[in-house]
């Protein structure tokens, strides 16, 4: 679990703090330093062969891809729990 950090543009990558949950439309190679800091990753797009899923597996971090609208529902500071095995994101406490 961790606090949400929305990454809506590249400039947001510098805002992520260690232990936050990176939430983005998708990830790309330049997201990897931020992904290393994150406790987990959630993306709107993608699947088991997406960049986010592959890098998350390599880093041993929980990841849920293909949520369709996580970036619209979640807000910076929300406390969430990720179950990467089942593909479930639970909002524990809103901002």
Residue ranges: model-predicted function:
Residues 4-11, 15, 19-20, 25-27, ...:
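Acidic, glycine-rich flexible loop/linker segments
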């Amino acid at each position: 679990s961790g606090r949400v950090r929305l990454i809506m543009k590249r400039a947001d990558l510098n805002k992520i703090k260690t232990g936050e949950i990176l939430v983005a439309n998708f990830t790309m190679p330049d997201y990897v330093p931020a992904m290393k800091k994150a406790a987990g990753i959630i993306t709107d797009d993608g699947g088991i062969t997406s960049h986010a899923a592959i890098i998350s597996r390599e880093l041993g971090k929980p990841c849920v891809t293909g949520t369709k609208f996580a970036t619209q529902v979640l807000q910076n500071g929300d406390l969430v729990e990720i179950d990467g095995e089942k593909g479930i994101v639970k909002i524990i406490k809103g901002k």
